Amino acid sequence: MSFQLDQSTSVIKTAPPGRLEFKNEPIDIASSNIQDLAKMQTLDGYYQQTSLQLPQSQQYHRMYENVYNNQQILYAQTQNFQYPSTLLTNGSLAQTEWRGQQMDTSAYSNTGYSRSSTSQQPQYTQQVTENERIVYKPVDMPSPVDSGIGGDISILNPKEEFFTSADGGSMLERSSERTLSHRDSPLVIPKLYNNLGFQYVLEAPISTSVRRDDDRMTYVNKGQFYTVSLEYTPDLNKCLKSQTVKSQLMVVFREDKTYEEEIKTWQSWHARQHVSKQRILEIDSKNSSGMIGQIEEIGNNAVQFYWNPSDPSGVRISIAVQCLSTDFSTQKGVKGLPLHVQIDTYDGENDKVPFHRGYCQIKVFCDKGAERKLRDEDKRAQKRKVQEYTAGALPGGRKKSDGEYHDQCERSEFYHMRELDKPAALFIAPEEFEPRYVDSTSLSFDMSEIEPIPTKRPRTSERIMLYVRKRDEQIYQPLHVVPASLSGLALAIANKFGADPDKMSGVYKRCAKGITVKVDDEMLRLYCNEDTFIIDVEHATDGSTAATLIEVAPTNPNSYSNS
């Protein structure tokens, strides 16, 4: 049925019954100047589209990648448009046939397929080499682990699940690729799995909120000592050539930093410390055993010792980490960065590459934060189990996280690292660096590659600690001098001994030689930090107060020269 539009009334009128109009006949709705449609050029070629059959994005197991090597980058759920040859300026492009290329999937039929999400979000798969394959796809929420990484865009390596057909049996094979996001570390560390050879264990409980596909996370407290045990089980496939081995235990960054970046980060951390001799890694020698000789400090973040692998008791060394994971966060409120307790063991004395390298991922908290973190995770785990039990009791329900997280364990086993060539970053503080006291042969890198150490100079601090007591007392009291000046000392004395800081007439120091000097800012900053004194506070009749600090001579006269 045709229709006619009356322009005066804008009312559509239908044609009388029985009237036939051909499709090529002009219609009255057109203006009078374009009524003759027969003289116009046909534009069907500009709008006609070939029927499209867009290929579905499919991802196949790696064993079938070689079957389709010639396939280039495949973009799923995209739109293609046809352009006529008259609109193309490049003649070579005009010969290109525009059609949706249907993927030939005959090589994959009834063989195996990759189960992926049914979400309508686009997936982009780039088929390149085995080591360069990157897949960008939506992913479920990662484990609630505080990795400290900022909210960057996720670059994801999905966990592939490959299923064989019914003829091949039901087999599930999970690849070694990790699921990554902004909430856990983007670093995938190649590992070796071997129950023989060197085995290291950190005596601290692991987190139960980390997925099995991610490395175990161990929470420790700053300054608290934990035991690390080293043992060796003979491996016939990789035998030792020496009876005594050298091990270097260190604290390093988990992030994939270069050697220079890691050293600069440690330098920045050390510059913020109040004590110039502050170490990153502390050792309790009294509670350590199994070493041959003494434990050597080869860096602020590393120690070295020798031991006999054939000794069945192995080595037990007590360590404490003196830095926080939040010390390396660039923004306030960002979760702390994870660190590694790394052990490099050398078979030969002069070997540059370690025979074995193991690591344990840790996160360092303050004020018993590790225990609080573990308690919170235990509560979440119990709540998760209740939800799983409820979901499993419903018809068709299943426990989604069965075996998904690491089980609770009071000991954290070290992973065996595959890469051994990367040199360990041993940080030596500028104030402690003396070339004549450092044996370059004991280091695993060339000393000439280290940047020149700045000239040694006195380190000024914003805080000074003094230990004082009255004559009739036996216990010393700490005086926190903030700021590190005479006014700060007067304020500390007034607050500690009940005087008015505005009426302090003077502060004096009586040296061990018997002379009395008036304390000034330079003397306080350069010569009095962590010294011990007997204090005399005298109150005058006019309300003023004077304090005299009497230096206590050390019991060992050589203790000052050795410090």
Curated annotation (Swiss-Prot):
Instruction: State the residue spans of region: Interaction with DNA.
Output: 326-335, 372-375
The transmembrane residues are none
Query: Looking at the record, which segments are called Disordered?
Result: 377-405
The record's listing under InterPro entries reads: CP2, TF_CP2-like
- Compartments (UniProt record): Nucleus
Where does the Grh/CP2 DB domain lie? 194-428
Entry's Gene Ontology cellular component terms: chromatin; nucleus
Query: Which Pfam families does this chain map to?
Result: CP2, GRHL1_C
Keyword Nucleus part of the UniProt annotation: yes
Q: Which GO terms describe its molecular function?
A: DNA-binding transcription activator activity, RNA polymerase II-specific; RNA polymerase II cis-regulatory region sequence-specific DNA binding; sequence-specific DNA binding; sequence-specific double-stranded DNA binding
Where this protein primarily resides, as one coarse class? nucleus
Q: Which UniProt keywords apply?
A: DNA-binding, Nucleus, Transcription, Transcription regulation
Q: PANTHER family of this UniProt entry?
A: PROTEIN GRAINYHEAD, TRANSCRIPTION FACTOR CP2
Q: What does this protein do?
A: Probable transcription factor. Binds a motif with the core sequence 5'-C[ACT][TG]G-3' in regulatory elements of target genes. Many putative target genes show oscillating expression levels, perhaps as a result of rhythmic variation in accumulation of grh-1. Plays a role in proper cuticle formation and/or barrier function and is required repetitively during development, for successful completion of each molt. Involved in modulating lifespan. Plays a role in defense response to bacteria. May act upstream of the p38 MAP kinase / pmk-1 pathway.
Instruction: Family membership, please give it.
Output: Belongs to the grh/CP2 family. Grainyhead subfamily.
* Official protein name in the record: Grainyhead-like protein 1 homolog
**What would be the name of the gene that encodes this protein?**
grh-1
